[in-house]
From Swiss-Prot:
Catalyzed reaction equations: uridine(34) in tRNA + AH2 + O2 = 5-hydroxyuridine(34) in tRNA + A + H2O
Disulfide bonds: none
Highest taxon of source: Bacteria
Protein name: tRNA uridine(34) hydroxylase
EC number: 1.14.-.-
Family membership: Belongs to the TrhO family.
GO-annotated molecular function: oxidoreductase activity, acting on paired donors, with incorporation or reduction of molecular oxygen
Rhodanese domain: residues covered: 129-223
Gene name linked to the record: trhO
Length: 308
């Protein structure tokens, strides 16, 4: 389909826990529709619901949202929306998975039962300033390293599925505490806060709408957030705090303030590191000597053959 060059583009993030009896058929129909209206992005479909982020021209994004909400299961879906200059995804990917977000529990938590109470952005800001409240980041380590709420606890996990083990190893930190957890858009906290309640922690809360909603709220304006927010698209980093910008990221090599992520130039490693441009050139885009000397080093291929 054709688009006018002056179309405003939008990127949306959303999720909805709702039963999907035949995820594969749902996925196939969903892919066909998204492709037909020119949307790009990533969507996960599971028996427990849908979790997605898409980009496209404003008209097509609104068309998609209206179409999804016509399904009674998704009529209450909340979409977080931002304006962008163009597509922020290279392709459209819709996959069927066992869970929307993978906690790898032997028995999946029941999201229709007890879960962490929602805190609106204003309430979350108040919780951030409470002395005895534990603010727990439910995201991965590389997300935390780029930006996080001030004084938030960092579980230092590589994958969301590592959180349950971290909780079991750190019950002494959580016991008898008011626990407030947060993530990018809220989908991880829905499941994680339910897990915490199931584990016997009673005073559990979650940031409603995630970091994205908090940063855009007119009263909070992202206050007490330091750094930038990691996003899973071509932007990589987006601002949250509208009042001040405190850089917390540190260059992988020299520890200087940095908010620029690259992937290690060894395709078999691909580790994400915060790295200034001068250090990328110095270390051939790699995270180690071993990776810099790898025969498939992408940095060397690119600079030895600029047309490749």
């Amino acid at each position: 389909m054709t688009q006018t060059s002056n179309s405003q583009y939008l990127v949306i993030l959303y999720y909805q826990y709702a039963p999907i009896k035949d995820p594969q058929t749902f996925r196939d129909q969903h892919f066909k529709y998204c492709e037909s209206i020119g949307l790009l992005g990533r969507i996960i479909v599971a028996q427990e619901g849908i979790n997605g982020t898409l980009s496209g021209p404003e008209e097509q994004i609104h068309k998609y949202m209206d179409q999804l909400k016509q399904d009674p299961r998704f009529c209450n879906t909340v979409f977080k929306m931002e304006t962008v200059e163009a597509h922020v995804f290279p392709r459209l990917s819709i996959k069927v998975k066992p869970e929307l977000v993978n906690l790898s529990l032997q028995e999946n938590v029941d999201l229709t039962k007890d879960k962490g109470a929602y805190l609106a952005p204003q309430e979350f800001l108040q919780a951030l300033q409470e002395k005895d409240t534990l603010i727990l980041d439910a995201r991965n380590d590389y997300e935390y390293d780029l930006g996080h709420f001030r004084n938030a606890v960092n579980p230092n996990i590589r994958h969301f599925r590592d959180l349950p083990n971290w909780v079991k190893q750190n019950t002494h930190l959580l016991k008898d505490k008011k626990i407030v957890t947060y993530c990018t858009g809220g989908v991880r906290c829905e499941k994680f806060s339910t897990f915490l309640k199931k584990e016997g922690f009673d005073d559990v809360y979650q940031l409603e709408g995630g970091i994205i909603s908090y940063g855009k709220h007119p009263e909070t304006q992202g206050a007490l957030w330091d750094g930038q927010m990691y996003v899973f698209d071509q932007r990589i980093a987006v601002p949250v705090n509208q009042k001040e910008h405190v850089i917390v990221g540190k260059d992988y090599f020299d520890g200087t303030p940095c908010e620029r992520y690259i992937n290690c130039s060894n395709p078999q490693c691909n580790k994400q590191i915060l790295c200034h441009e001068y250090n990328e050139h110095k270390y051939l885009g790699a995270c180690s000597d071993k990776c810099s000397n790898h025969p498939q080093n992408r940095y060397l291929k690119k600079h030895n053959n600029p047309n490749s």
